[in-house]
């Protein structure tokens, strides 16, 4: 069974388009937000399986707030710089995973339910 929706917010429109296309094979609805407020509205409306959030578009406090606001929804963060300290803080704030923005496959793997990950890896 295909998860229904995913919502993403990216600072780079090219990354947003690439992720949206990649995720459309695994999710019925891929909703690209242009702001944190728009992301919140889309998440409240569509109750996504996961939120993919660029750390250049949000603060650690935003990650923590989203995790509490949308309990049960996976929060996958990404950033263009591979910074272990920042990622550790992000995971501590409540993110389920953190990946480099350039690692589309890693972001997709983190967002897709484990039961479907064998199809993603193929």
Regions found by a protein language model. Give the residues of each.
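Conserved acidic carboxylate
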Residues: 10
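Two-component/phosphorelay signaling modules centered on CheY-like receiver
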Residues: 13-31
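Acidic, metal-coordinating helix/loop segments flanking the phosphotransfer/catalytic sites
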Residues: 34-50, 58
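Conserved phosphotransfer cores of two-component systems
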Residues: 44-46, 66-72, 93
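Conserved phosphotransfer microenvironments
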Residues: 49-69, 83-86
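Two-component signal transduction core modules
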Residues: 51, 98-99
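Alpha4 helix (beta4-alpha4-beta5 surface) of REC/receiver domains from two-component response regulators
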Residues: 79-98
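Receiver (REC) domain switch/output surface
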Residues: 107-122
């Amino acid at each position: 069974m295909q998860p229904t929706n995913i919502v993403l917010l990216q600072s780079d429109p090219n990354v947003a388009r690439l992720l949206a296309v990649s995720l459309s094979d695994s999710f019925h609805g891929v909703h690209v937000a242009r702001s944190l407020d728009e992301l919140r509205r889309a998440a409240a409306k569509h109750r996504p399986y996961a939120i993919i959030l660029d750390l250049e578009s949000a603060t650690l406090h935003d990650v923590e707030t989203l995790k509490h606001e949308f309990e049960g929804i996976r929060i996958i963060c990404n950033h263009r710089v591979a910074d272990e300290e920042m990622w550790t803080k992000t995971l501590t704030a409540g993110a389920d995973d953190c990946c480099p923005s350039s690692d589309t496959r890693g972001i997709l793997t983190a967002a897709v339910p484990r039961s479907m990950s064998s199809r993603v890896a193929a």
